[in-house]
Each structure stands twice: as structure tokens, then as C-alpha cells.
């Protein structure tokens, strides 16, 4: 039966509906906010796998073009593989939801939020998040919900709940917060150098609405009726010889956990575990049935050792204290032919960033249901398997897209406006080594490579990943976490920014009791770390170079009247093509009359600019041109001053000082002129130049009549 509930969230009602659509799914909710509607469904497989150490969850957010009344562009007129935006929204939904599923359920779970309608004002991603969370909570799949999500913008010193696209564009803060009734579980967003206090206040504002939406879902359960949950595939089991295993292995495992160097440490831990396996197999205490439980017990011991060392001794596996940052080495200009390059190495994490400058033709065109967009800044993050000493396929996965997006948002606010720097900018980050925080290393190397390329960025940007180990009311915040600290810890909080404020952030929390004070402490510690990293980066390069790379394309801009655009283009593009071919430049003409020239030869570009200026310039009496003789007749010659203007050079004298004969005949003149250069009026005829079609001559505008016809006279050198 159809059930509907609504709640005022910001300026619109959030409407949740179930019982009408997709009734064969385990759970289905239709969510509407303003004119944006998303249907979210959740299904699970019939069979389960035992002893999984992960949740087999997949989230497939997708947007239908018909939602905006559009047909897909290109040759294929149906939706294809997921766009980057759909991947990013899928990750937004996945991350806060995944820790709330019980691993013992064992079945594959698929959540599919589908945008069915959009008003192109209210972003459908937040609608899709709440639809997905509600669908799972109402389903028969075991889930420790409810959870909800809210977006906050900060505009004119005021917080806006679930802002419109325009408000997000104008805001200095765009933050998405997800959480449960117990606390915040995820934060992600970008900003324009906001303070830690503003960020915390935005999270507080979001959490008030999150609690209301969670209570709305609980009310929904009361109306619809709580469904009996599907059974767990297995009960939590532990290795029955865990005590003996601990006595046998704990001391050696503890020593292995503190071996210096990631690869050496991993190898040492692996050898200790292998030794334990061989011993317990020999006494028939490990077999196929309990092998998974055996290795899980070893992992539990490792986690216990690492966490206890941090909580009790403030000692991390690589020997650092909680606030200490790994050694940093940075340099620029490694690659000679690129437009800008930088290498940032922090401990065993290394990112090589390369900046390339292109023209407006290189912009990425986005065919999107929210409206077509042109992106003139892109950051692509690559994580090859060799960065962690492994083999594998070289491909771009969801993780790469997500990490690249976070780094891009962190740098974007510091870039110049397109009108001030009309280049297309592409930054590629190659992760060459990885042991935690590679996305923040990308921010650091990307910022330096932009400066090295001569992009006038406002400020240097650095990033740091923060971690957390907690037990009860006690917690220790970690600066610059390792990969294992991310895996074994309770939080991954990435913060990027300048010396003035925060520009990008992403937080995932595995525990439910994260307090405001804890987040405040984490942000304060992150700021100290960020300042330290910025000081090292500034010692290498502290400001953008005055000039762009000699290898980058040059740009010249000029403005013409709108009604002169057709003159520059010419009939069927003839004029602009001639300029392009002759001067080896690209010409970009905007509808507002702004013309941009792209090329590599500065001299040719200046000549192309002069040609365009001459085309659109209004002729004035007395101006001198170097024109081409286009046609000669008995009265004179037609001279092409510009591709769009011609003047007439007459051979008939206007006074006694005008002494030119018929230009088509001999250099001594003809007709009434005598052989000796004197005519019947006793005027002197100089030897005029012989003019031929195609010849270049220097002329001066002597007169312009009321019809715009131009009369010329020769200019003698």
C-alpha cells in the first residue's frame, strides 16, 4: 500500500514514498525534493558466503536524461557507462552506509538510486542519498540505521540547507554531511579558504536536520510496519585455539609490527603469520574449516598491538609520535618538455604531478542532466599497481575518480578566473609510491606543479590525512596516517587548505561516538600539520612564476564589436581560415566579441592580431595602408586594404600636381601625354610605377564619401 511522509528541510519538503514503485525489490523508496525525484531500490542475493571480511555492497547511482527532458548527445542515444559524476555520488552513498551492514549477512547487496526527474535547481545527489538510506532501512536486510544526509552552503555569512545549484556556485563552502542518531559518519566537500570554526558550525547545522530525517524514517517504519529481517549467514565465531595462538605468536608479531619500512614490515608480519600457520597445521589445529578464523585471529592480534601502542605509549609502527609528520622531500621541474612538474615525497608516499596548459578547444564538454558544462580545469589521479609493489591492470576505477575529485576540489578555488587566465588546465598525478594519504600528496604536488607552470594561483595548497584510535572516552588523533593506520584505525579525515583556510576535506568514521570536541581537536591538529607542510613546499616554490613555460601555447586576447564578428569570420569562414593558415594560430571567437588567439610563435600571433584589428578598424582619412592591387581598369586600380575593405586609386589628376597616366600602359603614360612627358596643358608627368594585379603598394586614404567609398593616393617612400 502506498505510504507518503514529508518533512520540511530548508526551503523545500523532503517527501518519502513507498509501496507504489518497484515492489519486488527488498526495499524501494521514492524521494522528492522540490522538482527533483529519485527512486532508490535495494536487493540482495539468495545465497551467502561465510566468513567474509568485507561487505559485498555495490551502489549504482544513475541519472536518466529524460529526467531533464533531454536526449543523450552523440551517436548512441541511450545512457551508457557511468559518468564520473555518477561514480562520485555512488561513493557518497556507499561510504556512510557500508559500516552499518553486518558482515555476517554474507549476501551480495545492490543499491540502485535512479534520478527520474530534476528541476535543474535542486541537486538530485542529496535526494538520492536519502532515498537510498531510507530504502535500505525499510527493507528486510539487516542494517544498523537509520542514517540521513544534508548539504550545507555558506553564503553571505549565512548557512543554507540543501542549497540550489546557483547558491552552491556562489557559496564559499559546499559540504555534504551524513550521519545517524548517534553521530556523524561522513563529511565531504570543498571550500574557498574557510576557517575551521565555519566548517564545524556547518556540520552542527547539518546534524540538526540529519536527526530530523532519521526520525522521519523511524516514523515511516511505524506506518509501513517493521519487516522481519533476513537471517545472518553465520554467527560470529572465533578461532577456538586463540589463547594458545596468542601465547605462541604475540611477542614475535609485536616485534614484526615495528620493523622499519613498509615492505620490510609487511614481509616480517607475513613470515610470523606463516610460521604460526605451519605450527598449528602440524598439530591439526588449523584445517580448511577454520583457516579463515585462524587468520582473522592473527589480524585481531595485529590490530590490538598497533592500537594499544598508540593509546598507551603514543608510539606508532614507524616510530613516530601521534603529531609527527613523515620526512618530506619536494622539487619542481623534473621533466623538461612539460609545462610544469613537481615531485612530492612524504615518507613512503610519492606523487608526481604534471601540469599541461591548453586552449579553450581542449576544455572538457560535459553533457549532463543539470545542463551542459565546459570544464577548463581537470585533475586526473592515477594509482598504478607498482606503487605498492604489486602487479595488476592499469585502469581507472572508482577509487581513482574519487581521489582525483577530492584533490581537484582542494585546488580549484585557488585558480584564477577564466577571463584572467584563459587556458585550459590539466593536472595529472602519478602515484609512484603509496603508504597512505596519496590523495593529499596529490594536492601538494599539484599545487607546486601549477606554480611551476606559471598558473597564477592565489595561494599554495597542502593536504594532510588525519587518523584516530579510540577506546571508550580515550582517543588519540594521528597526523599523516599510514595505510595500515587507516585500515586499523577509527577515522580517515583528509583536510587540504592554504595558510588562510580550508579548501577541501573528506572524513569517513568507523565509530558512532565522534564528538564535536574530537572533530575540533582533529581540525586544529590538521592545521598545525598543514602549516608545517606548506613551509617545506614554500621553500621549494612559494609563488607562481611570472611567465608560463616556453613549451606552453601563447595566448593573445582582443575585444571587438559584436557587429564586426561576421567580418572576422568572413564568408563561409574564409577570412578566419586565412588568418589561421597564414599565421599558424588558433582563433577562438566568442559571441560577446572576445577573440582569443592561441599559438607558439609570438611574432606571428602579433601579426594575426594586427590583421584582425585592421579588419574591424573603421578607416579614417590620412591613414596609411599597405594593400594589394586587386583589379586595374582604365580609370585606376582597386586596392584591397583588408580582406573586407577596398579603396580606389585613380589615375586621373585632380590638380596640376597630380601627374599619373593610365596605369595599365607604359611607364611613360599614354593617351594625351607626349613622348617627352608634356601634355597640351603644359603639365609634367613623372614616370609612375607600373602596377600589376597582386602587387603590394603603400597608399593613403585621401577621402571617404558619404556612401563609405574610399579614395586612395600613393605614398612615396
Curated annotation (Swiss-Prot):
Cross-referenced InterPro entries: ExoRNase_PH_dom1, ExoRNase_PH_dom2, ExoRNase_PH_dom2_sf, KH_dom, KH_dom_type_1, KH_dom_type_1_sf, NA-bd_OB-fold, PNPase
Region (Disordered) residue spans: 650-683
Cofactor: Mg(2+)
Entry's Gene Ontology molecular function annotations: 3'-5'-RNA exonuclease activity; magnesium ion binding; polyribonucleotide nucleotidyltransferase activity; RNA binding
GO CC field: cytosol
Composition skew (Basic and acidic residues), residue ranges: 654-665
Subcellular location(s) of the protein: Cytoplasm
PANTHER family tied to this protein: POLYRIBONUCLEOTIDE NUCLEOTIDYLTRANSFERASE, POLYRIBONUCLEOTIDE NUCLEOTIDYLTRANSFERASE 1, MITOCHONDRIAL
Protein name: Polyribonucleotide nucleotidyltransferase
Source organism of the structure: Borrelia turicatae (strain 91E135)
Amino acid at each position: 500500500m502506498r505510504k507518503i511522509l514529508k518533512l520540511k528541510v530548508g526551503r523545500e519538503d523532503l517527501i518519502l514514498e513507498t509501496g507504489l514503485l518497484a515492489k519486488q525489490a527488498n526495499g524501494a523508496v521514492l524521494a522528492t525534493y522540490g522538482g527533483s525525484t529519485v527512486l532508490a531500490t535495494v536487493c540482495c542475493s539468495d545465497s551467502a558466503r561465510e566468513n567474509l571480511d568485507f561487505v559485498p555492497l555495490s551502489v549504482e547511482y544513475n541519472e536518466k536524461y529524460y529526467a531533464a527532458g533531454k536526449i543523450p548527445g552523440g551517436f548512441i542515444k541511450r545512457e551508457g557507462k557511468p559518468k564520473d559524476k555518477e561514480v562520485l555520488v555512488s561513493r557518497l552513498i556507499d561510504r556512510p552506509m557500508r559500516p552499518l551492514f553486518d558482515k555476517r549477512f554474507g549476501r551480495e547487496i545492490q543499491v540502485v538510486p535512479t534520478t527520474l526527474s530534476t528541476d535543474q535547481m535542486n541537486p538530485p545527489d542529496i535526494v538520492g542519498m536519502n532515498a537510498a538510506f531510507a530504502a535500505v532501512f525499510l527493507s528486510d536486510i539487516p542494517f544498523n540505521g537509520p542514517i540521513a544526509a544534508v548539504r550545507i552552503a555558506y553564503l553571505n555569512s549565512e548557512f543554507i540547507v540543501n542549497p540550489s545549484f546557483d547558491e552552491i556556485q556562489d557559496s564559499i563552502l559546499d559540504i555534504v554531511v551524513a550521519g545517524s542518531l548517534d553521530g556523524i559518519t561522513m563529511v565531504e566537500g570543498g571550500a574557498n579558504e574557510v576557517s575551521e570554526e565555519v566548517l564545524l558550525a556547518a556540520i552542527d547545522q547539518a546534524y540538526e536536520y540529519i536527526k530530523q530525517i532519521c526520525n522521519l524514517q523511524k516514523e515511516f517504519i511505524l506506518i509501513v510496519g517493521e519487516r522481519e529481517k533476513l537471517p545472518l549467514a553465520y554467527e560470529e565465531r572465533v578461532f577456538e585455539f586463540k589463547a594458545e595462538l596468542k601465547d605462541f605468536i604475540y611477542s614475535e608479531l609485536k616485534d614484526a609490527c615495528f620493523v622499519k619500512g613498509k615492505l620490510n614490515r609487511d614481509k616480517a608480519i607475513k613470515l610470523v603469520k606463516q610460521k604460526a600457520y605451519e605450527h598449528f597445521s602440524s598439530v591439526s589445529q588449523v584445517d580448511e574449516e577454520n583457516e579463515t578464523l585462524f587468520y582473522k585471529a592473527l589480524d585481531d592480534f595485529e590490530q590490538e598491538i598497533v592500537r594499544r601502542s598508540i593509546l598507551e605509549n603514543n608510539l606508532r609502527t614507524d616510530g613516530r609520535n601521534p603529531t609527527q609528520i613523515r620526512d618530506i622531500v619536494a622539487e619542481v621541474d623534473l621533466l623538461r618538455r612539460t609545462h610544469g612538474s613537481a615531485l612530492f615525497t612524504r615518507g613512503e608516499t610519492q606523487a608526481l604531478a604534471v601540469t599541461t596548459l591548453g586552449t579553450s578547444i581542449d576544455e572538457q564538454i560535459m553533457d549532463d542532466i543539470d545542463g551542459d558544462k565546459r570544464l577548463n580545469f581537470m585533475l586526473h589521479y592515477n594509482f598504478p599497481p607498482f606503487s605498492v609493489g604489486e602487479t595488476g591492470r592499469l585502469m581507472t576505477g572508482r577509487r581513482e575518480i574519487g581521489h582525483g575529485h577530492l584533490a581537484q576540489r582542494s585546488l580549484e578555488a585557488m585558480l584564477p578566473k577564466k577571463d584572467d587566465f584563459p587556458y585550459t588546465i590539466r593536472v595529472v598525478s602519478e602515484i609512484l609510491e603509496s603508504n597512505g594519504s596519496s590523495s593529499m600528496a596529490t594536492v601538494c604536488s599539484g599545487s607546486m606543479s601549477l606554480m611551476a607552470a606559471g598558473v597564477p594561483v592565489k595561494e599554495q595548497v597542502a593536504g594532510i590525512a588525519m587518523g584516530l584510535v579510540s577506546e571508550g572516552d580515550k582517543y588519540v588523533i594521528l597526523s599523516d596516517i599510514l595505510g595500515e593506520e587507516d585500515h586499523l584505525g577509527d577515522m580517515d579525515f583528509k583536510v587540504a587548505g592554504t595558510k588562510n583556510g580550508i579548501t577541501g576535506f573528506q572524513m569517513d568514521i568507523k565509530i558512532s561516538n565522534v564528538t564535536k570536541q574530537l572533530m575540533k581537536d582533529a581540525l586544529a591538529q590538521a592545521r598545525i600539520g598543514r602549516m608545517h607542510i606548506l613551509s617545506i613546499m614554500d621553500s621549494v616554490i612559494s609563488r607562481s612564476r611570472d611567465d608560463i613555460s616556453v613549451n606552453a601555447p601563447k595566448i593573445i586576447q582582443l575585444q571587438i564589436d559584436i557587429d564586426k564578428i561576421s567580418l572576422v569570420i568572413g564568408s563561409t569562414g574564409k577570412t578566419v581560415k586565412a588568418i589561421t593558415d597564414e599565421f599558424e594560430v588558433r582563433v577562438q571567437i566568442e559571441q560577446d566579441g572576445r577573440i582569443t588567439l592561441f599559438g607558439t610563435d609570438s611574432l606571428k600571433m602579433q601579426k594575426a592580431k594586427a590583421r584582425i584589428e585592421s579588419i574591424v578598424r573603421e578607416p579614417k582619412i590620412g591613414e596609411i595602408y599597405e594593400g594589394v592591387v586587386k583589379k586595374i581598369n582604365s580609370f585606376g586600380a582597386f586596392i584591397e586594404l583588408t580582406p573586407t575593405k577596398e579603396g580606389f586609386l585613380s589615375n586621373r589628376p585632380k590638380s596640376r600636381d597630380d601627374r599619373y597616366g593610365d596605369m595599365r600602359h607604359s611607364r611613360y603614360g599614354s593617351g594625351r601625354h607626349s613622348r617627352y612627358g608634356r601634355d597640351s596643358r603644359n603639365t609634367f608627368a613623372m614616370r609612375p610605377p607600373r602596377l600589376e594585379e597582386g602587387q603590394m603598394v603603400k597608399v593613403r586614404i585621401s577621402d571617404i564619401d558619404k556612401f563609405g567609398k574610399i579614395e586612395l593616393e600613393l605614398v612615396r617612400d
